[in-house]
């Protein structure tokens, strides 16, 4: 098992390096600069600013300097927020996105798996049709449509919940963005769990367990659930990426001070160092999470190690 974990870690290093390299050159070769806005600066002022941030250095010099910065954990200065470094901005916004993303992910897994298992056990009944109807609806409606609808219903019409803001991560401020962010993944996980559970329940080893007279509850939780969750586990990697990218829209709609909104503001203001750093951070988290999923998959199904 340790050998498998080490192999996955070693595989992640070149992937992260390629991500950093591609992201850096795409940002540096993009047209415009952080200092070309609606108000044109005099050429000498622009030259002095670019010299201050070493933007007029050869691109390979900038690249190796950036790698050296990253090796020391320094994301560099922000071009838009002059009084803060990128590290300061990330440190302030990352806990918001992490809390929202973790809550949405857990909600999607818990409700999605539970609904999928119920639908499989109640196949071709009212319960099954209800879950699958919800799943189809949740998959086709994007989060940027769900989010304002939730605000209109629960914040404006019923006035049960606030329609935006963070307020230190209080639960009532998290409910609407958490539901909007997780709804599509609840639906997808429910569909995957249902299909996988139905397949497992028709397996020979489940028939054998039933023939031995084992209680249905024990058959489900001791024998059927574990193999049925393997496809769900495979889906968790893409789901995690989707929740991270989806948070950019959700945080903007609900006015949450997370890395999603920070990324959007950085992109609109051409803040190269901020956008590049957030891209690398999200990419690194994605690589890390996929590696964790692979390890969990190997724990459940030892055949995957070889």
Curated annotation (Swiss-Prot):
Reported phenotype of the disruption mutant: Double mutant oppB-oppC cannot take up cell wall peptides.
Keywords, ordered alphabetically: Cell inner membrane, Cell membrane, Membrane, Peptide transport, Protein transport, Transmembrane, Transmembrane helix, Transport
Record GO biological process: protein transport
Annotated membrane topology: Multi-pass membrane protein
Signal peptide: none
Primary site of residence: membrane
Subcellular location: Cell inner membrane
Tagged with keyword Transcription: no
Domain ABC transmembrane type-1 residue range list: 94-293
Keyword Signal: no
Cytoplasmic compartment segments: 1-12, 122-133, 189-227, 301-306
SUPFAM superfamilies according to UniProt: MetI-like
Induction: Part of the opp operon, which is constitutively expressed.
A GO molecular-function annotation: peptidoglycan peptide transmembrane transporter activity
TM ranges: 13-30, 102-121, 134-156, 166-188, 228-250, 278-300
Residues in the Periplasmic compartment per record: 31-101, 157-165, 251-277
One Gene Ontology CC term in the entry: plasma membrane
Pfam families linked to this entry: BPD_transp_1, BPD_transp_1_N
Origin: domain of life: Bacteria
Matches recorded under CDD domains: TM_PBP2
NCBIfam families per record: PRK09471.1
Description of how the protein assembles with itself and partners: The complex is composed of two ATP-binding proteins (OppD and OppF), two transmembrane proteins (OppB and OppC) and a solute-binding protein (OppA).
Entries under PANTHER family matching the protein: DIPEPTIDE TRANSPORT SYSTEM PERMEASE PROTEIN DPPB-RELATED (PTHR43163:SF6)
Protein's job: Part of the ABC transporter complex OppABCDF involved in the uptake of oligopeptides, including the cell wall murein tripeptide L-alanyl-gamma-D-glutamyl-meso-diaminopimelate. Responsible for the translocation of the substrate across the membrane. Plays an important nutritional role and is involved in the recycling of cell wall peptides.
Family assignment from sequence similarity: Belongs to the binding-protein-dependent transport system permease family. OppBC subfamily.
Protein name as annotated: Oligopeptide transport system permease protein OppB
Organismal lineage: Bacteria, Pseudomonadati, Pseudomonadota, Gammaproteobacteria, Enterobacterales
């Amino acid at each position: 098992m340790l050998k498998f974990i080490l192999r996955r870690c070693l595989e992640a290093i070149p992937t992260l390096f390629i991500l950093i390299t591609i992201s850096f050159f795409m940002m540096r070769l993009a047209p415009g600069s952080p200092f070309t806005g609606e108000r044109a600066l005099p050429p000498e002022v622009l030259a002095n600013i670019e010299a201050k941030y070493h933007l007029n250095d050869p691109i390979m010099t900038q690249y190796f300097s950036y790698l050296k910065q990253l090796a020391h954990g320094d994301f560099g200065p922000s071009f838009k927020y002059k009084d803060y470094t990128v590290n300061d901005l990330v440190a302030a916004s990352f806990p918001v996105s992490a809390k929202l993303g973790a809550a949405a992910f857990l909600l999607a897994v818990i409700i999605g798996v539970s609904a999928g298992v119920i639908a499989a056990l109640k196949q071709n009944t009212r319960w099954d049709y209800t879950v699958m109807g919800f799943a189809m609806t949740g998959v086709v409606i994007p989060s940027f449509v769900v989010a304002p609808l939730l605000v209109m219903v629960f914040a404006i019409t019923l006035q049960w919940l606030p329609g935006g803001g963070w307020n230190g991560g209080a639960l009532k401020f998290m409910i609407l963005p958490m539901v909007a962010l997780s709804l599509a993944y609840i639906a997808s996980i429910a569909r995957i769990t249902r299909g996988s559970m139905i397949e497992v329940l028709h397996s020979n080893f489940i028939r054998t367990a039933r023939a031995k007279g084992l209680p249905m509850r024990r058959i489900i939780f001791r024998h059927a659930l574990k193999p049925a969750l393997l496809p769900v586990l495979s889906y968790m990697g893409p789901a995690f990426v989707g929740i991270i990218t989806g948070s950019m829209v959700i945080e903007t709609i609900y006015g949450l001070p997370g890395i999603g909104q920070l990324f959007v503001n950085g992109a609109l203001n051409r803040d190269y160092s901020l956008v590049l750093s957030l891209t690398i951070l999200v990419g690194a988290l994605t690589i890390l999470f996929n590696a964790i999923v692979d390890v969990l998959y190997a724990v459940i199904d030892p055949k995957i190690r070889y």
